[in-house]
């Protein structure tokens, strides 16, 4: 009897210790919330006395429901992910290519059969905040519901009202092709239990209305962390390295913390505002890839006071260093001085296809948007962004019209693209890259339509 009692106590004790360890592990992996760094006190929206940081820009407070919904839909950048290349806007079909398969974005037009036309208000909120579809199935976090969960109910329903005002598009989309066990949607219930806070935005009472507005825009609507914050072991955002930069579908989303060496710390407020609004900041480069799309479809359509609020918030994010990257460029080369790892092939391609626009010094005479010196991509020793721009080209919308760089993906081989990319980083960047043909082939796979 004594032995039995001891065994029972041992089992109970072990279970308690195990539970504590498990809870501790979950707490550690989950990490801090997105605004924990501010160290202030979160309060209910109704209890924040300085105003309402949610909703639309202060300049649009008298706008109609549909006008507010359109503004918020654009701020949330919905069109980029829910529009396939060459497809109808919001009709879905955009492919997310992952190491374990491909998934496709959904049709969010109000079509009754293939879209969201049957969604009630509560079902729409469940999808936005909890990642749960109308049929009860779990959404994958390619839909950034762990960020959208902070969007207020009123704003989410304004987005729904705008989407439901659009013309329904019948679009039968491809089936996801995810490998086991990633194709088991039910398992996302446990992932969400750990990593989705399922809570609406709560202002920080120690911060200004402008800061809180910027936080709401950056964390909830614009979901900046989804690209710019590294992932943890559970593929959720690792806010211990908030905004430190991360790889996204082959591209490198750069450090946007306040770090002076590798982030935005050396940028002026005007630099950041210009980059968000126009996709370019003098001495810092031009937005391409997903960031370019975010500028075109979202940030460029935001009111100036909202851009200013985001700048205020970004300034407050603690510095997080990216060891292999520097925002500091090499001095502009003189004459035809080559980079330290320049190849004959790389120089030949640059001379034939690049120099006429970008210049031998990296200071473009055609447009400041084509200047290479200072560009984050050129200073990235992985050279992935440089290679992807060469492969796919890029296009920027400016107040004076569109400015394009053509795609060279079909004109040059993987070896040639690697050579010219390495030449560019060696000649104009802080550190030479060593991209290989195999690296370029992998990049092609990740961005292929």
PLM regions: where:
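Active-site substrate-binding loop specific to GH73 endo-beta-N-acetylglucosaminidase modules
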Residues: 90-101, 106-107, 229-280
